[in-house]
Amino acid sequence: MAVPARKTSKQKKRSRRGHIKLATPAMHYDATTGEYRLSHRVSPKGFYKGRQVANENKQQNND
């Protein structure tokens, strides 16, 4: 079984993991509500692509 000959230094470890990071979420301006929101999601007011697709005061029951 292979065993490392030397301890991996902090610099070597961190440079190897340099590409592992979180991506910035894709946000865009919603003209109907005047706020920024995630792309391809319904706004809290119930709008998607400028159309009302859901009522904001309607709650779903997950029973």
UniProtKB/Swiss-Prot annotation:
InterPro entries for the chain: Ribosomal_bL32, Ribosomal_bL32_bact, Ribosomal_zn-bd
Biased composition (Basic residues): 7-20
Alphabetical UniProt keywords: Ribonucleoprotein, Ribosomal protein
One of the GO BP terms on file: translation
Disulfide linkage: none
GO cellular component: large ribosomal subunit
GO molecular function, one term: structural constituent of ribosome
Chain intervals for the UniProt region annotation (Disordered): 1-23, 42-63
Pfam families hit by this protein: Ribosomal_L32p (PF01783)
SUPFAM superfamilies in UniProt: Zn-binding ribosomal proteins
Comp. bias regions, Polar residues: 54-63
Taxonomy, superkingdom: Bacteria
Sequence intervals crossing the membrane: none
Family (UniProt): Belongs to the bacterial ribosomal protein bL32 family.
Stored HAMAP family: Ribosomal_bL32
PANTHER family assigned to the protein according to its UniProt record, in alphabetical order: 50S RIBOSOMAL PROTEIN L32, LARGE RIBOSOMAL SUBUNIT PROTEIN BL32
Official protein name in the record: Large ribosomal subunit protein bL32
Species name: Lactobacillus gasseri (strain ATCC 33323 / DSM 20243 / BCRC 14619 / CIP 102991 / JCM 1131 / KCTC 3163 / NCIMB 11718 / NCTC 13722 / AM63)
